[in-house]
From Swiss-Prot:
Transmembrane keyword on record: yes
Annotated region (Disordered), positions in chain: 1-30
Compartments where found: Cell membrane
Membrane topology: Multi-pass membrane protein
Glycosylated position list: 85, 232
UniProt cross-references to SUPFAM superfamilies, sorted A to Z: MFS general substrate transporter
InterPro entries recorded: MFS, MFS_dom, MFS_trans_sf
Keyword field: Cell membrane, Glycoprotein, Membrane, Transmembrane, Transmembrane helix, Transport
Keyword Transmembrane helix set for record: yes
Disrupted-gene phenotype: Decreases the production of itaconic acid.
UniProt-recorded name of the protein: Itaconate transport protein
Transmembrane segments: 47-67, 86-106, 119-139, 143-163, 174-194, 203-223, 287-307, 319-339, 366-386, 390-410, 438-458, 460-480
Taxonomy, superkingdom: Eukaryota
């Protein structure tokens, strides 16, 4: 479904797949435009972005609240450390694959209905996990839990693509990622405290207690943003698309209903489940996803092994293990805000320098040349600090830098993907989820056997070198040929 036929809005949202070079006319508003690109005010955009950001918070929070209790679960369910890691692995597999279904559906039926459906699934899964004492059922319900929570990340990126233009998108992507990367900071602390005071079931009771009210909040306040349904946001909605308490978010100049907005239930439907996989057919996006996924997988080498390493090397209990995740999460929060501001600055600088147009792939990856080596150096240093049994402050510092530089890199790549697929940003972000979560699942599954065989130092050295080599190769190819590939696809 091509939104160019229905939204009536010029600019990049009118393209299902955007060219790599953005015309120089973006420097100034078009005087003949009678409708703004987005009818939502700046404050309203921030409200929408913060709402979907909170939705994206639950997925990483749900996985990280659980990690400090892994040694406890192994003891209570009489399983091995490798077996308990499987419950993390299946979560990440479902985290990667479920958006392939939900994101295309949100590109057809709208963001709001899919948000509500998936969070209801998440709530029910949390309730079931709260009473689970059987290993196989724990594995199954963890997959259901992930399938409900993880769609919010891809749909959230699509929502931001609905309401923002390229020149402002970097900052909003930073705000969007803020809550998403706060989950790794507070999740382990909450999980460690709950599992130490009671047991691992308490973490799922807690998730049930917070996901229920947020589901109600979305029913009350979340607005529809999909442009083929509401245009630039000024079209009136009804039924499932209308929040129970409808806030006044639009500019006064755009309050009138927009003609020509199609009901997605009318006509022939293309659910587009294949659409995320088509993203891999474009070389520039497949290379960006590969680089992103390598960083993500190597990051989970450190976070997935932290509970066992810090318990073995430093003798920490569940609560203190959870506290050790805080620096990484704080680094993630700092990184996402910084990356958003730097992205907008990079884009404006490229726009000012260009006489023909902005080369999007180069503009969005300018700072990535710095982030990637800094991240890999942090991973290398972290591994050898743990191997040498240094004071715990040293690996904690590198946990902070790992979180910061990885998040800055993720924000750059995510923004590039949204720019290249403005009409189908949710589906494109689902493709990113497939790559990152599948490689991350592999990392979680192999990290403990690797540490047992090679030691922490060489395990993280190998991870850092592979990430650096693959990432740099991908970036060089995108820098040299990205514009040509995107132009060829667009033509």
């Amino acid at each position: 479904m091509d939104q160019a036929d229905h939204s009536g809005v010029p600019d990049d949202a009118a393209l299902e797949e955007a060219p790599n070079t953005v015309p120089i006319q973006e420097k100034s508003a078009q005087p003949h435009d009678t409708q703004p690109y987005c009818a939502f005010t700046k404050r309203s955009k921030l409200f929408i972005v913060l709402t979907v950001s909170l939705a994206g918070f639950f997925s990483p929070f749900a996985i990280n609240i659980y990690i400090p209790a892994l040694p406890q679960i192994a003891g209570m369910l009489h399983t091995s450390e490798a077996a308990t890691n499987v419950t993390v692995t299946v979560y990440m597999i479902a985290q990667g694959l479920s958006p392939v279904i939900w994101a295309p559906l949100s590109d057809v039926f709208g963001r709001r209905p899919i948000y509500i459906l998936t969070f209801f699934i998440f709530f029910i899964a949390n309730l079931g996990l709260s009473f689970t004492n059987v290993y196989w059922l724990l594995v199954v319900l963890r997959m259901v839990q992930a399938a409900g929570a993880c769609s919010a990340i891809a749909i959230g990126a699509g929502t931001i693509g609905d309401v923002t233009e390229r020149k402002e998108r970097g900052s909003y992507m930073g705000y969007y990622a803020l809550a998403q990367y706060t989950g790794p900071a507070i999740g382990p602390v909450v999980g460690g405290a709950l599992s130490q005071r009671w047991d691992y079931h308490a973490t799922f009771f807690f998730l049930t207690a917070i996901s229920g009210p947020f589901l109600l909040f979305m029913l009350l306040f979340l607005v529809e943003t999909l442009r083929v349904i509401v245009g630039n946001g000024s079209a009136k909605t009804s039924g499932i698309y209308r929040p129970l308490v409808e806030p006044k978010l639009q500019r006064s100049i755009a309050n009138a209903p927009r003609p020509g907005i199609k009901n997605p239930l009318h006509g022939t439907l293309d659910f587009g489940f294949h659409r995320p996989f088509l993203v891999f057919a474009r070389p520039e996006t497949s290379l960006a996803i590969l680089a992103f996924s390598m960083v993500y997988a190597s990051y989970y080498l450190s976070s997935g092994s932290l509970p066992y390493l810090f318990k073995q090397v430093y003798g920490l209990d569940e609560l203190l293990i959870g506290v050790c995740f805080v620096p990484s999460g704080v680094g993630c929060a700092v990184g996402t805000v910084l990356a958003g501001k730097i992205l907008d600055w990079d884009y404006r600088r490229a726009l000012d320098k260009s006489k023909l147009g902005v080369k999007v792939t180069r503009a969005r990856l300018q700072s990535a040349w710095i982030y990637l080596p800094c991240y890999c150096a942090s991973l290398l240093a972290y591994g050898w600090c743990v191997r040498a049994h240094t004071h715990i402050a040293a690996p904690i510092v590198f946990q902070f830098t790992l979180g910061m530089f990885s998040t800055m890199y993720f924000t750059n790549v995510n923004t590039l993907i949204v720019d290249l697929y403005p009409g189908k940003a949710a589906s494109a972000t689902a493709a990113v989820n497939v790559g990152r979560c599948l490689l991350g699942a592999v990392a979680v599954a192999v990290v403990q056997p690797m540490i047992d065989a090679m030691g922490a130092g060489w395990t993280f050295t190998l991870g850092a070198l592979l990430t650096l080599i693959v990432g740099l190769i991908c970036q060089v190819l995108i820098y040299l040929y990205g514009e040509m590939w995107a132009a060829r696809k667009h033509s």
